[in-house]
Amino acid sequence: MGNLAKPDSVARVTNARQRGLEIKKLQEEALAQLPLNTLYIVLYIRSDPPRANDFHWGYYFHQTTSGGSKYHMRNLGGGWIPDHGPTSGVFKSNFLCVLIQIANVPEPKHAILDQTMRSRDDDVNQIPGVTCRIWLMTILQRLIEEGLVRCDDHQKLQDECMMFGNQYSATAASNSQPRPVVRSKLCK
């Protein structure tokens, strides 16, 4: 008799499974609704409760209805390493806060985008004061120079991203789904 589940514990498990399936469906729908060939700055909260202006920064480039490419740097204690590659799970990432659309990249320029994203992989730890945010801003400057992102002031874009991150961090901590997608007002 000790192995029999109590009815309320069964209900909790069933509700948790249903909630998990609902979240998965919402995430898949959100991914499919992203416009193709769009580039995003992606912010993740680093703590719960979230702290203001404290995010992990990365890029996401949406190429198909089922996914795209992630570009970001990870700190392994002794330095930063690239963590780029295909993903179908941008909305499934733990602590995802917000996606901020910054550009549409036409298909003929996809290779240039990928090369630019990887352009500092070999010397990332030589970027002064490198963090994921500083790497992202360094790459952003190159994306602007390449004409892939049209933004007049990358510092104001960083501030705008912080504002969006702070706005949505509490709902990220409570795992409200799907996570918001916004468009930068500073990028053309």
Where do the model's predicted regions map?
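Non-catalytic ligand/cofactor/substrate-binding and regulatory segments of enzyme domains
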Residues: 2-131
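Activation targets extended, charge/polar-rich intrinsically disordered C-terminal tails
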Residues: 119-188
